[in-house]
Every structure is written in structure tokens, then in C-alpha cells.
Amino acid sequence: MKELPKIYEPQQVEGRVYQMWMDHDCFKAEPDPDKKPFSIVMPPPNVTGQLHMGHAMDSTLQDILTRFKRMQGYSALWLPGTDHAGIATQIKVEEELRTKEGLTRYDLGREKFLQRVWQWKEKYGNRIVEQQKKMGASCDWSRSRFTMDEGCSKAVRETFCELYDKGLIYKGSRIINWCPHCLTALSDAEVEYVDKPGHLWYIRYPLSDGSGDIVVATTRPETMMGDTGVAVNPEDEKFKHLIGKTCILPIMNREIPIVGDEYCEIGFGTGAVKMTPAHDPNDFEVGLRHNLEVIRVIADDGTINENGGKYNGMDRYECRKAIVKDLEEQGYLIKTEPYSHNVGTCYRCHNDVEPLISAQWFVKMEPLAKEAIRVVNDGTIKFVPERFTKTYINWMENVHDWCISRQLWWGHQIPAWYCDECGHINVKRDDPTECEKCGCKHLTREEDVLDTWFSSALWPFSTMGWPDLDSPDLKYWYPTSVMVTGYDIIFFWVARMIFSGMEQMKKEPFKTVFIHGLVRDDKGRKMSKSLGNGIDPLEMAEKYGADALRFNLITGNSPGNDMRFYVEKCEAMRNFCNKIWNASRFVMMNLTIDHVELPKKLELEDKWILSKLNTLIREVTDNMDAFELGVASAKIYDFIWDNYCDWFIELTKNRLNSDDQTTRENAQNVLCYVLIETLKLLHPFMPFITEEIWQALPHEGEFLMLSKWPEYNEKFSFPAEEEAMQTVIEAITAIRARRNEMNVAPSKKVNYTVATAHADTFSAGIPFFTRLASASDVTIVPADAAIDADGKVEVDTHAARIFMPLAELVDFEKELARIAKEKANAEKQLAGIENKLKNEGFLAKAPEAVINGARADAEKLKALIEKLDASAAAMKK
């Protein structure tokens, strides 16, 4: 055994312990036919990334589950990796090029630019991996993957070709979401909708025959140069007679048809809708049904193109102002109304997204969605919490075709070649040398790359060796056991992994989707750069220790719900680490044994703690299995702090100081046994401190992290003894509280009289009253015995009436006078605060933190007054 230092210093322990695990391949997983498989694939963080609090929580949850299953005897694989993060990485490298060298990617050309990106990835891409290690991540780092490594690239190409051959990938002109800032297409899931104030402009379109006009309402007058029709509901009596006629498009003076379509809602707006098929997905569908012309007027960079007439070259929002002014001057603008509506924005740069007609590559979703819906509906895949099942199903039932092409250079280049002669598209697993249709040798490769999420969708099986179906890893660990992820990427990623797994593997990618919420600041706000409220997890880990941070992120955390991060809680969890450390040091300083074995004869307090531990083992295991990690951690915390440290250690001190060796060693064995089993339960949550303490205790095996998880054992269930000890603890707690209220020092010994029907229980507890309740003597009498209460204070518990002759220790009159004075002072302070809280001016002007502080002070004063009243009442009995 080694001696633990007086103070626990995580900075001195964590790096050394982690390296010890790495040196001994503790995280390495191998397919083992004698063990059950357990696997998690890490949601790959962006290669550009630095660890933020969301990563820290996500990683901690996965690590807890992996360590738990590893200790339960599973061959547990936690497979790490990073994502190439198309747009994010390209933007980073372009910024570096521009600021350091004054160059653009076009100055370098595609090949040289990609060389720069790979160099950047090699330099910075490992940063987040090292940060995860500091948090204690027990991944099998030897299997670390990258979404653009050779294996993943092969899987991407195979999937693309398979889906294309089945007709599930196609190229077509459709309305897509376009980011004019990032200059690329976005999938529906990459668009965030924000409620923005705007206007509704009512515009008059004159009828071609001069018989009047039709009025439309629009939020986007800048697109009207691309209008190719006006639609009305065929059942709308107001407009029926106009269907088939034409009207004149203001400003452009172009004749456009009026068509009848049920898409238009009677009574909504004016009932007439301008049709811009090139810039609105609904208009595009109406246009297909009525053969309307498609005229695009907004260019890729968000400016008006040559089809916009005199507005050519203007920014789209400048054009809006100009065209509204022209419409007003020419008499076409009827009225303007304020109007708040949802505007699509880019998830990365937050600029407004532009719906554009564009030739892009798409995945046909309807056939793929069917199986992806079935495996969730029939329970093959379970969501935790279950409420997210509905969210997932609803999205999958209404899913649109997925736009997978991106106008970037960094990413998986689409494996399609256009024949320069006949225009045929050649999609091949290997680079073709000639056109499969006409034999022409001149082929031009598609420049677009695939959406980053395309490769991420294959992650559960591409990382296991697919498309090699004989891969030992794939056979053993697929389907994976759990996917741990945030609710914000159910559509981006979870849904796509499910339909990809069902299509490529004919098997679900995971059994359970464990959803967690976001980590918010202490005011409940999302952490962001713009608010400046982000908290660096590595700073917290450096200051308080990784274990304290991990425990903070888990305790009180429930599946699917956001959590607020309080720095003060990190401090509290560091105090918890210190409590465990000090308790362990106390145990070790009293150890003379070098092997732990429970004694055959157990005392009352031994049976109590073993029974409590046994219940804890069952409750922690059950909650871990149910993914209620926050509940499990809270139960461990309460057991260690209350049952073990505050009570059991104190209850054993008499025996530890006994002259009898057997008595001493029996106490040591139980203390040590309970500590070791508790360290095992705590280990997945706090891996560093538990391993360090365990290594210093008598133990079997090399590492705590590879030791056997405790199991519930009926032979350690002692309900009668547990109840008896709890009765004694309740009595001691009540006595201490009353003595504290009356300012009786612990050094003052008291002769207690206990009136109870549980004489045996209290007789067995006499040594504990002596040590923990400052008893000089304990007299036990029947529950109905007549007690002379003169000069005594009575304390009642569920099992006894306890009388304390405190008159000889306390000057009641003097103490009552002191209490009355303290109460009067507290009441005066309380009245002042309550008056302030009734003042409307104070409530309107004071910062929220000040108001909350005043309310908290008022509650503290109320509690103090209540306590003083109780003390006075006790003395007056």
C-alpha cells in the first residue's frame, strides 16, 4: 500500500493516471467470443473544433456508459474519430490564407488549396483529441477514424454508386436552400428558421384586357422580376372568372398567366399569390403543374442577375428598397403592413438563405424513409427519452429529397464524370477512362463535393470496416449498442444514420438513441460567442479537476433536458472529491491489514452499511441501465457523503481504537470493503480520483477500471438491522439539532432518558449516543413510563421520546432573552426587505440578480426566525 498525500491535487494525478491506462492498453477492445459486445461510435467532432461544454458533456456520458459496461464484463468499444467538416474547415483555411498571405483559394487552385487543408488538418486536427483525453475519455484510440480517411472514403464512394445505380441518387434542377455568404447549397436540416420583423407589400397587377387588376401580397418584392404567373384557388368566387386570363407584371411589363391551383388558400392574404418558380419551393411545384416559365433573378452571391433588368448588380436587399420605391412612384403599391414571419438562415453563418432553382445532386428520400420509420415504430431502435420518437417519426414522414451536393473544394468529391462528347453522366467506383455510353476518352469530373453529413451518415459501419462484410469488427460490434447525441442533430445525423444503416447493412445502426440536452449558462441562455457566455471546460478541469467537472455535468442531468451550468457546482464537486480523499486517508491511516475480507461476525452498524451499500448497488445499476445517469450519480454522492463519511466512519471509531486486535481488524475490513465497492460504483463518473485511491488500497487485479462491477447480493440485505440503525441515527440527529438550537457545546455531557418500545435497538445504540450525542449515560424506560419533565427538554422521533436535563447546562432565562433579541433584529431586517420587494419602482429598475438576492435574503431570515421560535418553544416546555 502507498500513502496518499494530505491534499488531493488533480493536476498531479490525472495526467499520470491517464498515461498509466494508455501504457497498459486499458482502453483497447478486441472481438471476444466469450464476452458480450458493447459499442459506441463517438459523434465525430469537427476537425476544426476545440472542446466546448457540449462536447464535454457528450463525451462524459459516453465514457460513463463505456466504463460501466467494461466493468460489467462486456468487450466494450468506444470508437473515436473526427469529422472533416466541409464548410467549417474550408472557411478556416481560407481565412488563414487571406489574413497571412493575402490569397484566395482560387489563387492557389483546387489541388494546391486541398494540400493546404490537409496540412492544416495535420497541424490542428488532433487538438480536440488531446482535449478529450484530459477529460478522461477511455476510447480505443488505436482505432481512431477520420471521415475522409481511406476506409471512410471507400465507404462513401460505394454508397454513392449503389444508391445511384438503384435510382436513389439523381441530379436535377430543383429549388434548393442556397447560402449567398458560404456560396453553397444547404440541406433542409441545415436551415434554421428565425422569426424576423418584416413587411407585407400589396401590389396591383393590371389585367391585360384593361378590365381591372388583381392584387397580390408579398414579403419579397425583390423576386417579382422572376414572376411568371399569378395563382388563385379555382373555388374562389372572387377570382374564378380570371382563371385563363393574363395580367401585366409591373416594372417588367411582361404578360403572365393567371392559373387556378388548390395550393392557394381562400381568404389568406388577398387570395391571389404571385408565382416565382425559380425562388420558392411551393411556387416551383405549382409551376410544374401549370407549365410556368422558370426565370431566376438572384445570383449565387445574393445580387440581382441580368434577368432583373435595371436592378442588375444590386444586392437583394438594396433591390427590395429600390423596387418598393419604384412601385410606389408608378402607382402599383396599394399598401404596406408590418409583418413578422419565419426566415430561413444558414446554420453556420446565420445569413438569410436564398431559395434558388439550381442543378444539384439529391437522395430520393421516400423509399429510404419507409424502413427508417418502421424500425423505430416497431421498437427495434428505442429513443431515450421516448418523447423524441414522435419528433423523429414526424420529420421522417414529411421528409423532402436530400440535397447532397456542395459547392466546396474540401470534402468527398462526387464520383461522377460528364462525357465531353455525349453529355452522359458516368458514376463509377473507380475513376473511368472512357464514357460507358459512347466510348469517348474525354471526361470531366463533377466539381461539387458531398454534404459532410453524407459521410457521417455511414459512421456506425464505415468505421467498422464496411464495405468489407467479413470485417471482424463489423461482425462483432455492429449494430452498435448506443448512440449518444444531442436533440439538435436528430435530423442532421440520427435520421440519416438510420436510413443508411437499413439500406446498406439491412440492419439498424444502433439499438438505442440516448438524447441529451444542451448545456446552458446559469441564466438558462445558450452558450455562444456573441453572448460571450461560453465557459471553457478545460479551464474548469484545470481549476477544479476533470472529475469535479464530469460530476457537475452529470448530477441533476436528465435525458433529453437542457441543463444549466453553475461554476459554484464545480466547486461543490471538488469539495466532494476532497471528502472522498480525506475519508480514504482516514481509512488507510487506520489499516493494519493487507487483504480485505469481511468478518464472519458483523456488528449492527456493519450490517446497516452493507445493507445500504447493497441497495445502492441495485439502484445505481438499474439507473445506469435506464440511462438515468444523473439519478445514479446523486445516489452515490448521498451514500458517500451521508452514510459512509458522516456516519459509518464515526460509528466505527470506537472499534478502531479498541485494545482488541480482532475488533480493530473487523472494523478495518468492513470500512475498506465498503470503500472499495463504492469506488467501483463511482469510477465511471470520477475515473481519476477513484483509480488513484484504489491503487493505494489493498486490492486484487491491476486496475480499478478493469475490475468487476459490484452486484446486488441477497445475503447482504439486512432490513431489520438497517431499520434499527436508522432509528438510532434519527435519534442522534434530533438530539444534535436540539442541542445546537440551544447552544449546548458538544463537550457538555448529558444523561439522556429514552422512553421507547424499542429497548433492544436503543440498548445496542448506547455506544453511539456516548460518542456522537455527548451522552454521559443513557437510561431506557418503557414508552408509557411517567417522566418527570421538570428542567428537561423533550425531543420526539418516530420511535422514542428523549428527555435531556438541560436546565443544569443552560440558563433558560438568559438564553430566552438572547433569542428574543436576535429574533427582533431578524424581524426588523425582514420587514425592510419585504417593503423593498413590495416597491414597484425597485422591482422595475433593479437588476434581476439584485431582486433575486433580496428574495433569497428574506427566505434566510424567515428560516432563522423559525429556528429561534423552535429553540424558545423547547425551553418553555
Language model features by range: what are they?
Residues 1-235, 259, 276-289, 293-308, ...:
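N-terminal, positively charged nucleic-acid-binding surface of large information/translation enzymes
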Residues 67-75, 96-106, 130, 134-139, ...:
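Secondary-structure transition/capping motifs at alpha-helix termini
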Residues 99-115, 382-383, 538, 559-571, ...:
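Short, polar/flexible loop-turn hinges at active-site or ligand-entry regions and domain interfaces
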